[in-house]
Amino acid sequence: MTHEEILSMLGDYVDYLIANSSAEAPMWNIEKVRSGKPNKWNYIDGCMITACLSLYKTTGDEKYLRFSKNFIDWFVQEDGSIKTYDPKEYNLDNVNQGKNLFILYDIYGDEKYRKAIDTIRSQLLTQPRTKEGNFWHKDIYPWQVWLDGTYMAQPFYMEYETRYNKMQGCIDSYKQFMNIKKHMRDEKTGLYYHGYDESRQMYWADPVTGCSPNFWLRAMGWFMVAMVDVLERMDEQLYNEYRGIMAMLKQTIEDVHKFQDEETGMFWQVMDHPGVEGNYLETSGTALFAYAVLKGVRLGYLPKRMAAWAEKAFYGTCDRYLSKNPDGSLQLDGICLVAGLGGKDHRDGSLAYYFSEPVVCNDAKGVGPLGLAYTEMIARK
């Protein structure tokens, strides 16, 4: 396929997904579909709605805005409560969807969105923290910091503090990134480990460093996008902190790029084990890299030379995994459904574990990031 054909196909693909989805039955949320349970407020839908709102902003096509508003209005009540969401669950994943409320509030001015923003902020006010001050990833994972959590919570936190709290929490957000760099970055590769246990008690944690054993691609992807999204919401008056995160972002992209597959432009599920039996070129993390770099270049955080790395990742993913079915429907493959640490399934962070999780098609953890990268590609045209 030519690049123009890929971009046209992706536009059709997103339209197909939203035409066949609602808040009660999002076809892109494969975990929900497989569970058979009613839908809940969750980060997976949040990622997809972020992509839809970005498409609205880039294209001006109101169908993306209408869909996003209808989707979120199913959850958000007039008093600002959010159907199925409990702040006291203390799960950072549930904060992700909150970013979209700022956009809807700016467009519509409906106070229910402002109240819902405060509902989500209430979670972060009492979210348990490590002794150094980082949010626990979830209440059920005490003393643990996961890379994923930076994307889930920090952009919302930075935007709230900048807009509504006189920037009081902005330095706190910055310090959480610096703690992650201190504890979770591998000096040899420049990559970041998926998880860190401050207590060093979990079976997956190194007894000395507290880190999990491997570099999971999607966690790195979330982390790269988190830095870009936080910078976008951060006031440049915070001179040292703003430049600190920007330098961290640039160094991370440089280090990650060394692991980009030369032939396809993609990245491996476990990043530093290319070609190992069971490992595979994975869609979601590659798309997150493409999005983070393209957006970072557009906003001036990253040098323009890096855009070529992102375009190679973007088109490489589409060439390998985007296809048309005989019935005309489109399909995006190569998406790791889920990966975590600990829990009832005894997830130990080993290579065998990361290779064992299901690989699926059309899940928003891949479609959402690719949709976001697609909006950046359109913006470059």
Predicted regions and their residues:
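Inter-helical turn/loop segments and adjacent helix faces that build the functional surface
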Residues: 59, 108, 160-171, 230-243, ...
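Acidic/serine-rich, low-complexity amphipathic helices located in mid- to C-terminal regulatory regions
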Residues: 148-163
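CBM-like carbohydrate-recognition segments
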Residues: 2-44, 61-65, 74-92, 96-98, ...
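Long, well-ordered core segments of solenoidal/helical folds
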Residues: 7-26, 66-83, 115-134, 167-196, ...
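Oxyanion-binding "anion nests"
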Residues: 224-274, 278
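Acidic/His metal-coordination segments adjacent to aromatic residues that form catalytic metal sites
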Residues: 76-83, 129, 134-139, 199-213, ...
